[in-house]
Amino acid sequence: MVASARVQKLVRRYKLAIATALAILLLQGLVVWSFSGLEEDEAGEKGRQRKPRPLDPGEGSKDTDSSAGRRGSTGRRHGRWRGRAESPGVPVAKVVRAVTSRQRASRRVPPAPPPEAPGRQNLSGAAAGEALVGAAGFPPHGDTGSVEGAPQPTDNGFTPKCEIVGKDALSALARASTKQCQQEIANVVCLHQAGSLMPKAVPRHCQLTGKMSPGIQWDESQAQQPMDGPPVRIAYMLVVHGRAIRQLKRLLKAVYHEQHFFYIHVDKRSDYLHREVVELAQGYDNVRVTPWRMVTIWGGASLLRMYLRSMRDLLEVPGWAWDFFINLSATDYPTRTNEELVAFLSKNRDKNFLKSHGRDNSRFIKKQGLDRLFHECDSHMWRLGERQIPAGIVVDGGSDWFVLTRSFVEYVVYTDDPLVAQLRQFYTYTLLPAESFFHTVLENSLACETLVDNNLRVTNWNRKLGCKCQYKHIVDWCGCSPNDFKPQDFLRLQQVSRPTFFARKFESTVNQEVLEILDFHLYGSYPPGTPALKAYWENTYDAADGPSGLSDVMLTAYTAFARLSLHHAATAAPPMGTPLCRFEPRGLPSSVHLYFYDDHFQGYLVTQAVQPSAQGPAETLEMWLMPQGSLKLLGRSDQASRLQSLEVGTDWDPKERLFRNFGGLLGPLDEPVAVQRWARGPNLTATVVWIDPTYVVATSYDITVDTETEVTQYKPPLSRPLRPGPWTVRLLQFWEPLGETRFLVLPLTFNRKLPLRKDDASWLHAGPPHNEYMEQSFQGLSSILNLPQPELAEEAAQRHTQLTGPALEAWTDRELSSFWSVAGLCAIGPSPCPSLEPCRLTSWSSLSPDPKSELGPVKADGRLR
């Protein structure tokens, strides 16, 4: 009793302290519970992370040719932004989100969060269907945790035919944009839940066990030995997309022989390339274009359907008696001659050549997503849940580039064997089906002993650069892509340990020199004086496509380029600046090309119909606009700076480490990226500062650069619209300048392909609300950076928001002329202007001779090259 009384007395005396302690314990428990929930959620959403998972030992060097990466994310929650640095083979540099402002102006009002775009809204769970609409109507920044670009729902009242319970399927339904796609997803899921979609077991006919991988050796002397029977004839299946017609012609020129056959499928979205390929095929009886076209997305089931349909076509073309089927893309190129390839295949005319993933089947199944159900619609590959691999068979796979015998192709296309029929059903709902279907059919068929674990190619894999989840906007998975070959990779092209006859990838916009080296190695040099060997042109716009394929930024830039060029012609010294050389543009440009020389971007070539100011017929001119460099390296002379370059642009390709938006044309609604390239040296921490045209410090952040770091890049989440005009990005160390560059946010003369209206200009060209680009204010850095007083610049910026019509065009032209210069003009047809050279006689025009990419007649030896 005494002890009880003491306890009660103590409780009464310290009841306030006890209550406080209990409250603190309760609060801590809630916090721990909350964070544990977050960790569990993140564990299931690893695909959202920007940084790729650590590679297994040897994975970076093993050439498995499989492009699957790891599980992607369907995007449950928007993640915080983070910076990245890249440096292959060494620990990456860290980008630190460090607020370097010294004070915050109390008068500034923090902006509301930017609205979520239709393609990036979080529509899973309770938020489904509650799309936020932005007042300005422009998209926000991409979210690392979402399937960027995946279409979003337009009809949230869709009701499936069964109760769908899987989180992957529910997420796909919430994100699909069309009712047809939602219906397809629901039908597939309902059939799968009922157990009637996937085969439970598949018959296996192969009597062998283990991997069928007979080694085949090859040396150059075998090409000279007599063949067993007549030389084989090859059906080349070329699967192409994009706009690189000149590189495709160069490939065709290298592999062409009159004894072979060429069947070309052009992606349904590549109309310009299709027109060019159809014209190309008219000159050769053994070159045909598929009369049908499909949209073949990366990882999609459509690619396998395209191959199977093409195989049927090739089997049924009268007179095309081919022995082998070889698929190629426009980024492939031969590494040995046609004679060597024919000799090799003639000695192995009963073999099928496919590259396998290796020995660890269970790991391959997980990595490839074969145990997941996928469906393709709305040009997206949706992950819908888990599934079981059919019993009774060995699942294999690796590369979707192969060399197959005609007999095996006939078996796959025409057989009613349950093995093929049921595997077709299984692979209809499979990610990357072409990387596994033919392997699995062959390895379980009676022809399993014909499999050779070699697809006769060498692929330039660098998984630390190529596995960046770059396809998550079209597939709910993380995938990999091989790197482009460069001259330093040439030794890899000379494989001696195994027979290889093709290599990939090559891109002339990235590096053309390696193609020159390889072409010389195979066929010798072109005659002395051959033009354009170091030049490359690629079309970016053609009038036949219409302006719908152009962004407002590109439409603004191309029309401004034409005006600048015509103004240059009219104001130049005689003989250019005569009345006969004064023109007015007629309509929109008819075509635009990228121009490269010696693997350096040289600018845009704009073809424009014009009307002479003097009396005369209409003419067509081509104009060359060249970018002007604005980089300043400002490191102290007594301290060698590691900084090599500082660039700002959009469409950064982390795999090839370049901006795909050549020339850096960007507008108020774009999301620019700052990229720094470094030489090796001591660790350093640098500060990056972005300054807008009115001297507003838009953002500042620190980057830590390790000793071996080569590239750092970061896209700050700036509020938009960005203020048009010249921006400055400074790089400092201890507030001492290392480098500085300028870039242009282009004032738009078009909005939604129509001339800009005043009510649109008033917000589109005004910068972000309250001049706040970030939640933090960095204006306190103005004095440290010695920025000018902003009043005059602010007044000019305010006037610019009211401009439309010719006044707006004049402002756009002035700004553009500070970053671009007219490098040349030429006439496509006859012109009275005495100083206009015919385009065909120039070295830079897209109409000038380009022998390396011109096909011409078949030579006496049956070849084009």
From Swiss-Prot:
It is an enzyme of class 2 (transferase). Residues 125-137 have a biased composition (Low complexity). Its cofactor is Mg(2+); Mn(2+). The keyword Cytoplasm does not apply. InterPro entries: Glyco_trans_14, XYLT, XylT_C. Residues 37-865 are lumenal. It catalyses: UDP-alpha-D-xylose + L-seryl-[protein] = 3-O-(beta-D-xylosyl)-L-seryl-[protein] + UDP + H(+). Residues 53-65 have a biased composition (Basic and acidic residues). UDP-alpha-D-xylose binds at V239, D267, T296, I297, W298, D400, W401, S481, R504, K505. Contains disulfide bonds. Glycans are attached at N122, N327, N683. Residues 73-82 have a biased composition (Basic residues). Disulfide bonds join C162-C190, C206-C448, C467-C480, C469-C478, C581-C833, C826-C839. GO terms for molecular function: magnesium ion binding; manganese ion binding; protein xylosyltransferase activity. Widely expressed. Expressed at higher level in kidney and pancreas. Its EC number is 2.4.2.26. The chain crosses the membrane at residues 16-36. It is linked to Spondyloocular syndrome: A syndrome characterized by cataract, loss of vision due to retinal detachment, facial dysmorphism, facial hypotonia, normal height with disproportional short trunk, osteoporosis, immobile spine with thoracic kyphosis and reduced lumbal lordosis. Pseudoxanthoma elasticum: A multisystem disorder characterized by accumulation of mineralized and fragmented elastic fibers in the skin, vascular walls, and Burch membrane in the eye. Belongs to the glycosyltransferase 14 family. XylT subfamily. Monomer. Catalyzes the first step in the biosynthesis of chondroitin sulfate, heparan sulfate and dermatan sulfate proteoglycans, such as DCN. Transfers D-xylose from UDP-D-xylose to specific serine residues of the core protein. This is Xylosyltransferase 2. It comes from Homo sapiens (Human). The gene is XYLT2.
